[in-house]
Amino acid sequence: MRISPSEAAMKLSLSPPPYADAPVVVLISGLGGSGSYWLPQLAVLVQEYQVVCYDQRGTGNNPDTLAEDYSIAQMAAELHQALVAAGIERYAVVGHALGALVGMQLALDYPASVTVLVSVNGWLRINAHTRRCFQVREQLLHSGGAQAWVEAQPLFLYPADWMAARAPRLEAEDALALAHFQGKNNLLRRLNALKRADFSHHADRIRCPVQIICASDDLLVPTACSSELHAALPDSQKMVMRYGGHACNVTDPETFNALLLNGLASLLHHREAAL
């Protein structure tokens, strides 16, 4: 992977195109903001696509102090600007949770650029259950700091049996997350942007084909959210994984990758046929 040479835009990590004019797929992670979230997908995606990963502004290798009114629209705009600066004007988007919200905003604001959208455990507007989960996590952050936030995070991401079988891995992930913690203020401003986002009155304007992937055992985002999203979009298909939790692409990459690869191939072909 190489780093985009643009100094004005966010740093992007781009894989070499596997062939001339290969489609571009942009991977957008959730609230954690790290491009490394998609490691279980990279090896299969780079065989067919030029893949773009990045750490979101205010996280990882794109450090910044975010404004109090930071928004999903700003996240979409700065990503699109970075892609254009890297010479990428048309791209498919795969977004997880917050990343799916950014993907929808991109599809609304830059319809000529977004060819296909894949929403993974996303939603139209935050569900009361999801809001409750984040309220608990915020209380942990305020009372116990970054360590409490990080240690509680796997409970919302992974199935219990998956975690129980991987205690050493989770300890290592906790240590890494603490070492690269985005900071309390940035985290809360990104979380507030997520909570304010509401696509319930705009989703019908998204014209690109959308693949919706959700997990039936997601503790953080009920599958009803994906059903509502599916009903609101003009052109979408929904796939439900029986197992995997909120981070189903990490816990069951074999099932997830098959759904993703088939969906991208089908929807990109569908898009080309419609042009």
Curated annotation (Swiss-Prot):
Protein's UniProt name: Putative carbamate hydrolase RutD
GO BP: nitrogen utilization; uracil catabolic process
Role: Involved in pyrimidine catabolism. May facilitate the hydrolysis of carbamate, a reaction that can also occur spontaneously.
Pfam families: Abhydrolase_1
Record-stated family: Belongs to the AB hydrolase superfamily. Hydrolase RutD family.
Domain of life: Bacteria
Classification via InterPro entries: AB_hydrolase_1, AB_hydrolase_fold, AB_hydrolase_sf, Pyrimidine_utilisation_RutD
The reaction(s) this protein catalyses: carbamate + 2 H(+) = NH4(+) + CO2
Species name: Escherichia coli (strain UTI89 / UPEC)
Keyword entries, A-Z: Hydrolase
E.C. code: 3.5.1.-
Coiled-coil regions listed: none
GO molecular-function terms, A-Z: hydrolase activity, acting on carbon-nitrogen (but not peptide) bonds, in linear amides
